[in-house]
């Protein structure tokens, strides 16, 4: 597999057991039910962008390498690169936020792979390579019995009259 394999863009091993760090004592009252603060390696700083030394998920160099792999003669404009990097950052942020909400819904203080996996499968129709979904099963339509078919035929026959 090439350098952009299953774990090149999103290293999900970082999400397997991230514990929330208490920011401070939560205030009493209406803010008591606020979302817990989770410290994730490589999250954006004050500027909102990840810096390369903070384990940025998608750097300009990686993006350029990916474009060259698709078409060696293609070159992206600076604005397009910035937009794609911003979209990638927004995607990561939305997935992590939703996964944190799922973990909170499970009444857990630990973000696990299954939280990220559930969100990606249900919202984005994406599967994480290497992680089975033994708990998440798609709904399978039950096969119809002969008795059911006869009842439905009788209903259709009576509604036509």
Swiss-Prot record:
Domain Histone-fold: 59-126
Key words of the record: Isopeptide bond, Nucleus, Phosphoprotein, Transcription, Transcription regulation, Ubl conjugation
Record InterPro entries: Histone-fold (IPR009072), TAF12 (IPR037794), TFIID_TAF12_dom (IPR003228)
Bias kind Polar residues: ranges: 26-36
Positions bearing Phosphothreonine: 43, 59
Tissues where this protein is expressed: Ubiquitous.
Region (Disordered): 15-55
GO molecular function terms attached to this record: DNA binding; DNA-binding transcription factor binding; protein heterodimerization activity; TBP-class protein binding; transcription coactivator activity
Pfam families (alphabetical): TFIID_20kDa (PF03847)
Residue(s) of cross-link: Glycyl lysine isopeptide (Lys-Gly) (interchain with G-Cter in SUMO2): 19
CDD domains linked to this entry: HFD_TAF12
Role noted for this protein: The TFIID basal transcription factor complex plays a major role in the initiation of RNA polymerase II (Pol II)-dependent transcription. TFIID recognizes and binds promoters with or without a TATA box via its subunit TBP, a TATA-box-binding protein, and promotes assembly of the pre-initiation complex (PIC). The TFIID complex consists of TBP and TBP-associated factors (TAFs), including TAF1, TAF2, TAF3, TAF4, TAF5, TAF6, TAF7, TAF8, TAF9, TAF10, TAF11, TAF12 and TAF13.
Stated name of the protein: Transcription initiation factor TFIID subunit 12
Naturally occurring in which organism (per UniProt): Homo sapiens (Human)
Gene: TAF12
